[in-house]
């Protein structure tokens, strides 16, 4: 999870009251440029959140090179295995959790779905641009489906930035534009993955869309899934403690 955050375009940071007051003072006095590197995410209602946008701290390729160089050190092989499980550049804890649930091997508690990439850039066709009003969009989770079937895009609908009317309209236009280009788009909410019963329905839907015959998990795989879920559905501000 830490590797995803290092390679991602987000950080989770909850300022103390003292730091919060200092940030407000700096913001109101314009002491720092608006693009100083970190940008705080606000909800559609203007509420400040603990989610921040920034450039990746380390590139995926750099992580892989470091992991290879550390293999001979204590814990190095385990570190290298973990690095290989990072599916791409994510933009939120929600995307990390969904990616880990879908891509982690079944023997490690996940679904073992292959062909998953994160935040893939998709240039829009002329007709799709007319619908969405933009020339490019990014797929939260993109499954490359074999045999010429429609690629599956799973869109993580986080409540922070998707909880008002304007966001709903924008999401709808974006979905329509992608569907016009032949993509299958599946909206995903946090509740659908955090609730295990709901997620059972979701994973079967994803399996069907990517052409995988879903096989029910063995008792051992179920225990591994419980362990995985316990480890990833945490207060992200406590990660690494």
Predicted regions and their residues:
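Surface segments flanking catalytic/ligand-binding clefts of nucleic-acid enzymes
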Residues: 46, 50-241
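Nuclease-adjacent, charged terminal/linker segments that flank catalytic cores
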Residues: 1-66
